[in-house]
């Protein structure tokens, strides 16, 4: 029967999709572009010159890499930063760091907080306890695919529900008999 169960699903699915989209906006996306390297990406709503990545190793050592830096500054080929515009994301700027593969480390995207540069605010965080947490970079941190899947599922459920209503009506009326 149609009942109220289907109507709840039809209403809840788009809401769940929106929650997934909102949840993914400030999360980090971790993958390995090639053996021995690690790519961490974070989506932001605005760009700022005061952004940097912080890597805290299990030994306690800290490494900081500025997102916007001069070519002559520290970092070189060891840590590469990348900024790109994401047209289908809720937050349109994706900040990425490519660094040597590290396990048992914590990676953070930070911004200088305060008027005079005192303190910092954490925008994204990623913990890398094992290699199982890292996937290959086949799909970038773009939420467009997730959004498309949610839309397709929503329309499929609505179409199935409408078909079910039409089928129930035709069964209730009964088969049509044709007289010759």
Curated annotation (Swiss-Prot):
Keywords: Host membrane, Membrane, Signal, Transmembrane, Transmembrane helix. It comes from the Viruses. The keyword Membrane applies. InterPro entries: HHV_UL121. Its main location: host cell. It is a single-pass type I membrane protein. It is found in: Host membrane. Residues 1-27 form the signal peptide. GO terms for cellular component: host cell membrane; membrane. The chain crosses the membrane at residues 143-163. Belongs to the HHV-5 UL121 protein family. This is Membrane protein UL121. It comes from Human cytomegalovirus (strain AD169) (HHV-5). The lineage of its organism: Viruses, Duplodnaviria, Heunggongvirae, Peploviricota, Herviviricetes.
């Amino acid at each position: 029967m149609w009942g109220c169960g289907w109507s709840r699903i039809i209403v809840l699915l788009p809401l769940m999709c929106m929650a997934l989209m909102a949840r993914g906006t400030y999360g980090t996306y971790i993958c390995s572009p090639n053996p021995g390297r690690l790519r961490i990406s974070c989506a932001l709503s605005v760009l700022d010159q005061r952004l940097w990545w912080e890597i805290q190793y299990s030994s306690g050592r800290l490494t900081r890499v500025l997102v916007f830096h001069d070519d002559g500054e520290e970092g070189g080929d060891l840590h590469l930063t990348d900024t790109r515009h994401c047209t289908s994301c809720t937050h349109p700027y994706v900040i990425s760091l490519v660094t040597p593969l590290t396990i048992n480390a914590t990676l953070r995207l930070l911004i200088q907080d305060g008027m005079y540069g005192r303190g910092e605010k954490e925008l994204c965080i990623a913990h890398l306890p094992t290699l199982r947490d890292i996937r290959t970079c086949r799909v970038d941190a773009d939420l467009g695919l997730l959004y498309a899947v949610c839309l397709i599922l929503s329309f499929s459920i609505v179409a199935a529900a409408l078909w079910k209503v039409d089928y129930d009506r035709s069964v209730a009326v009964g088969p049509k008999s044709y007289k010759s």
